[in-house]
Amino acid sequence: VDKTYYSKEGFEETFAVNHLSHFLLVNLLLDRMTKDGRIAFVSSGTHDPKKKAGMPEPVYKNEKILAYPEENYTNDKKGLAGRRRYTTSKLCNIYCMYELVDRLNQMSAKNITVNAFDPGLMPETGLARTYHPISRFVLKYFLGLFVIFPANINSVAKSGKTLASLVTDNQLKHVTGRYFEGKKEMKTSALSYNKENQKNLWNVSVELSQLQKDESVLL
């Protein structure tokens, strides 16, 4: 979050890693998936400002602003801008999930399900690698003590096991278009239901990733 990083393709790195790469991979794999395959996007509760997670609320105007932030004016200071890019990228995961569900229902004979998942805060990960050293220490060692409590603070192993159950549990075989905080189904943020944003994200993602019609059954 300390400064803006870019992928080798020229896209802002948070956006490229958290959304665009997943969008491209899913589309390239759809034709090879079994008829009852499952897709789970790893999102975050930080996409919803009502969660009061201590992160700036996401702002979605157009996907290209996310891909090329330095070319677009922003009032955010550097640290705040980086954290807002993170929460907005997680909102993109929700947009992508909803749009993918709609397109699969309209354009595919397969019964592929698509859901989104919030693994919670995982102190062991490298999310805070660019934070101040004191902040990194607190996040890694102090918050790590709270994984034994009911709050949505989890070890990587626990979140990984929950994610695996989302794509293997027979009780969820036909569940699609849902969002889970751990194993609990939750509503997504008010902004996440914006159909115009969902379609804009999809269309611009096709353009940015240079996805071709012969590469995806949804084009």
Where in the sequence are the language-model features?
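C-terminal helical subdomain
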Residues: 141-186, 195-197
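C-terminal/domain-terminus segments
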Residues: 109-118, 179-190, 194
